[in-house]
Amino acid sequence: MTQANSPHLLLVGNDQKVTWNDGRIRFLAPGHDSLSIFDAGADPARPEPVATLALPNSLFGPPVNLAVAPDQRLGLIADSMAWPARDDGAGWQPAPGRDLYVIDLAARPPAIAQRLEVGLQPSGLSINRAGTLALVANKAGRSVSVLRIAGGRVEVCGEVDVGTPVVAVSFAADGRRAFVVKTDTHRLGVLRIDESNAAPRVTHDPAEDLTTGLVPFNLVVSPDGALALVVDMGSPTASDGHADSVSVIDLTATPPRVIDRVMVEDGPEGIAISPDGRYAAVAIVQGSNNPPDEWFHHPRGQIVLLRIDGLRVTRAGAIEVGALPEGVAFSPDSRYLYVGNFLDAEMQVLAVGDEGLSDTGTRIPLPGRPAS
């Protein structure tokens, strides 16, 4: 889930191929995924639907596989998994894919403009603030794809080998660095970016890696560029019943460094920082997709609100939401938070204030289960 500037487009990627039955994962037939496009500008308390596109999407990976360019003329969405039939004919067997779609958001209605191939299993992606470059973290490819954006078109112009599975990436505020999540090695890699020549140059030196908490899965950089927050999932299976953390990274220091860890409940995945930089929200799975007889199962997920004061990050409250919350995004005015509840196939709207989070009661039905 991601939002952009005025008219404040909000993208929601829906995956209808994956579901759970009594806590057991099931793989369903492809062909029913979609991308929902909303405008959160006119009424942030209840975003208005703009369009729904038939488009493949995947729950596999962090819920940051889509992004909107700063000028809002295009969007990117990565589909991390191909979906072939099993050899024995008994259903479907997901496998790493390579597809990335470019959406023309200026068209009426919005439309698919390009289909590109990037590295294997494209997961999290990010567009720089100048709108000239995008990076895609490829989990199975152990690489980061580099995409040039110009004239409403996107071109794959490179791939950086990082030597280990990576699942999420985010640009620094100045666009000269980016940070990539190395989930298997519990590290955050630093990418150096040079756009001074015709072809952008992106490099990676493992010696600059930072150690995060266990199983980092997602990250976000603050609007002022001073800090990054890394979701430490704690277990490759997300929920395992144990408390997890969010690593706080000082990006103003040389070199950048972890300065704190804030404890959160079991199974953090989605994360977003408000446009005004005052708050961050973390989606907590809390075993809501696990079998009911598991000791750590909860029927609902949770959102934890974090308060940001300079480089200091503290808990500011929590609230229960629907089952298996994935993507989260703030409204342009920072007063509302949108939560994609996967198993409920809905977008829930929370109010954000000095007293924390409150439920507005608004539930927006979606044409599928929101994976991002």
Model features per residue range: what roles?
Residues 1-372:
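Predominantly soluble domains enriched in secretory-pathway, periplasmic, or organellar proteins
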